């Protein structure tokens, strides 16, 4: 049975405790995930926590940048603060409440701006072993340059990336570069010896959310084993 935990205005929807050794956090703008997280938790043998209620444009932006498309509010660059909130409060409270093991394997799934956040935080810390970035906003100003100059660390886990085949056809110039930008990210990670998997799927940015989430979990938990 799912349960909902509220932490600092964040709504954390938790699946049944399928595993105390594996937990996956999703940063996904869908409030009605109750049925899916229960089914996915059982299928993939992992306890799932879906976090919503974030200031989407700002907490997932790693540094301040002009708004996109032109005329939209600027991004405020609050990712460092949000990461600290996850590390210091959200994750400890969730995992204490769910009685997770002290050495729990922790993964992160994000989409769009939270997919950008998933990769950004993976490059600077080991809070999450593996990540999935679905249609990650790698067009974000300065991100490719940051990846090119950053030290890409050894990662024990893997990164799964997915992009819709219509996303590069956006009328917004910045968004239209996402295909090239994603290719650049994949090349940089592969050159650094990071284990990656990429899938191109039909559709635009937010098409078919549940099938895409299932693809991410299939990549992160390929053995489908139950603890």
Give the role of each language-model region.
Residues 22, 28-29, 95-98, 122-123, ...:
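Cell-envelope and extracellular/periplasmic
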Residues 41, 121-122, 186:
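A conserved amphipathic alpha-helix that caps or lines the catalytic cleft of carbohydrate-
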Residues 99-111, 131:
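Alpha/beta-hydrolase fold nucleophile elbow
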Residues 115-125:
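Short glycine-enriched nucleophile-adjacent loop
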Residues 138-221:
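The feature captures the conserved acid-bearing segment of alpha/beta-hydrolase catalytic domains
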């Amino acid at each position: 049975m799912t349960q909902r935990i509220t932490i600092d205005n964040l709504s954390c929807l938790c699946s049944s405790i399928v595993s105390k050794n594996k937990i996956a956090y999703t940063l996904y703008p869908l409030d009605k995930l109750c049925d899916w997280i229960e089914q996915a938790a059982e299928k993939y043998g992992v306890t799932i926590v879906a976090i919503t209620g974030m200031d989407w444009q700002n907490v997932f932006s790693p540094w301040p940048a002009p708004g996109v498309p032109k005329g939209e509010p600027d991004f405020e660059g609050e990712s460092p603060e949000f990461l600290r909130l996850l590390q210091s409060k959200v994750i400890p409270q969730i995992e204490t409440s769910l009685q997770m093991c002290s050495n729990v394997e922790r993964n992160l799934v994000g989409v769009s701006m939270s997919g950008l956040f998933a990769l950004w935080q993976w490059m600077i810390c080991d809070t999450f072993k593996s990540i999935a970035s679905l249609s990650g906003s790698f067009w974000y100003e300065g991100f490719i340059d940051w990846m090119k100059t950053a030290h890409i660390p050894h990662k024990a886990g893997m990164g799964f990336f997915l992009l819709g085949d219509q996303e590069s056809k956006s009328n917004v110039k910045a968004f239209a570069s996402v295909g090239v930008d994603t290719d650049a990210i994949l090349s940089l990670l592969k050159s650094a010896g990071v284990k990656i998997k990429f899938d191109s799927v039909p559709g635009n940015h937010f098409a078919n959310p549940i099938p895409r989430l299932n693809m991410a979990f299939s990549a992160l938990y390929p053995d489908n084993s139950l603890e």
